Each structure stands twice: as structure tokens, then as C-alpha cells.
Amino acid sequence: MILEILKYPDIRLKKKAQKVHSFAEIQVLIEDMIETMYAAPGVGLAAPQVGISLRVAVIDTSPPDQKNPFVLVNPEIISQKGETSIEEGCLSLPGPRALIARAEKIFVRAQDAQGNPLEKEVEGLLAIVIQHEIDHLNGRLFID
């Protein structure tokens, strides 16, 4: 099911999301978020953007003709290296874009959709999108 994406200045976008404890309860949410992300279209979507205050993000930086969604639950950045800047946009802020400084490489710790531990070092566009989505989970927008 395609979910409604909240638009700025909706106050729910500024709220820090809650940690997920029950993974059985988020399976449909994850499926709906992935469908919503592709329909938007976007490369990432955080649960607070669809009005759900949980630390869940879905990401896909694959070429448009491929679908390889990456799910992060309760993500946290453990370390970061380097700096890069890229012009970012946001599904919750249609239209405006801004040049944002981000870490070039990050080490992220999270859980997958089933609750299994996940640790990954990523760089490039995937690292940038993960940082953007974690900002949403912390109640921050790229214009803040």
C-alpha cells in the first residue's frame, strides 16, 4: 500500500523516532515503505516521513531498472571518515534542494527487517542517503 508522505512543516517530521522492539509488527510497514519509496520516486524513506515514529528506514540507490531495497532498523553511525558535498532533495520537502556536507564513508550498525544484527561500512551515495535518513529518524531535515 502506498503511504502518504508528510510534507514540511508537519510537526511530526521534527520528532525523534522511537526504537523498534517488535520486528513482527513492522513487516507490513517495511513493505509499504518500500512501495511508497519506489512510487514517489525516491532513493530513501524514513518511517517518520509517513507518520510512524519508529527508527526504520528503507533505501535503494540501485539503477532505476533494478530494485535492491536495503532496510535499516534502529540504525546508528559508529564512525565516519572524510567529507563530501552533494545537492540533496527530500520527499518531505518537494522542490528545494541544497548542497549538504556529509561524511564520505560511514560505519553503520543496525538491524535488518528480521531483527538480525547488521554492521556495514559504506561510502558514496549509499553513505549519503543513510545519513539523510538517520537525520529524519532524529527529527532533522536537510534544511535545519
Report residues per predicted region.
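Positively charged
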Residues: M1-D144
